[in-house]
Amino acid sequence: MAQFSESADVPDMGRRQFMNLLTFGTVTGVALGALYPVVNYFIPPATGGAGGGTTAKDELGNDVSVTKFLENRNAGDRNLVQGLKGDPTYIVVDSKEAIKDYGINAICTHLGCVVPWNVAENKFKCPCHGSQYDETGKVVRGPAPLSLALAHTNVSDDKIVLTPWTETDFRTGDAPWWS
């Protein structure tokens, strides 16, 4: 009678173990593939551009050219662009040839609504709960507890570049609460 002996040629994994391993690998791969966009959603956009800043984007996601931006705008105009961390940011027109050296984050410090610029009253007015900010974004009427955040605006290769504001807030004389 012939006896079977274990040899190196005989695999030690049975059919059931192989199918379990194959199923586990497939399910794990699909789960990781499905989780990737979910995890990516919670990671803020990387900053790039000149000096660690973010190039301002228009409503279509294109880089904002300073010359085109200033073509149809007057001194004192405030126009929204996509700024640091993807937040809506107002670029302030200084003259027909230049923009101010700061941008104003349009997110209300009360509950996070986007605050529109009211040209008739020369101030920002939050539509959600009535907070009001002056032309520089300083809070003048609550319930918002703080002024709107600032960002530096620079021009590099005809593009508007926003960088974080870390110096003293010129409106209040205090350290910036947002940095």
From Swiss-Prot:
The protein's name in its UniProt record: Cytochrome b6-f complex iron-sulfur subunit
Gene Ontology CC: plasma membrane-derived thylakoid membrane
Molecular function GO labels: 2 iron, 2 sulfur cluster binding; electron transporter, transferring electrons within cytochrome b6/f complex of photosystem II activity; metal ion binding; monooxygenase activity; oxidoreductase activity, acting on paired donors, with incorporation or reduction of molecular oxygen; plastoquinol--plastocyanin reductase activity
Disulphide-bridged cysteine pairs: C113-C128
NCBIfam families linked: Cytb6fFeSPetC (NF045928), PRK13474.1 (NF010001)
Annotated signal peptide: none
Record-listed E.C. numbers: 7.1.1.6
Keyword Transferase: no
Catalytic EC class: translocase
Named cofactor requirement(s): [2Fe-2S] cluster
Function of the molecule: Component of the cytochrome b6-f complex, which mediates electron transfer between photosystem II (PSII) and photosystem I (PSI), cyclic electron flow around PSI, and state transitions.
GO biological process: photosynthesis
Subcellular location: Cellular thylakoid membrane
Subunit-level organization: The 4 large subunits of the cytochrome b6-f complex are cytochrome b6, subunit IV (17 kDa polypeptide, PetD), cytochrome f and the Rieske protein, while the 4 small subunits are PetG, PetL, PetM and PetN. The complex functions as a dimer.
Protein's membrane topology: Single-pass membrane protein
Something else known: The Rieske iron-sulfur protein is a high potential 2Fe-2S protein.
Location of the Rieske domain: 61-162
Catalytic activity annotation: 2 oxidized [plastocyanin] + a plastoquinol + 2 H(+)(in) = 2 reduced [plastocyanin] + a plastoquinone + 4 H(+)(out)
Binding site residues for [2Fe-2S] cluster: C108, H110, C126, H129
Keywords in alphabetical order: 2Fe-2S, Disulfide bond, Electron transport, Iron, Iron-sulfur, Membrane, Metal-binding, Thylakoid, Translocase, Transmembrane, Transmembrane helix, Transport
Entry-linked InterPro entries: Cyt_b6_f_Rieske (IPR023960), Rieske_2Fe-2S (IPR017941), Rieske_2Fe-2S_sf (IPR036922), Rieske_Fe-S_prot (IPR014349), Rieske_Fe-S_prot_C (IPR005805)
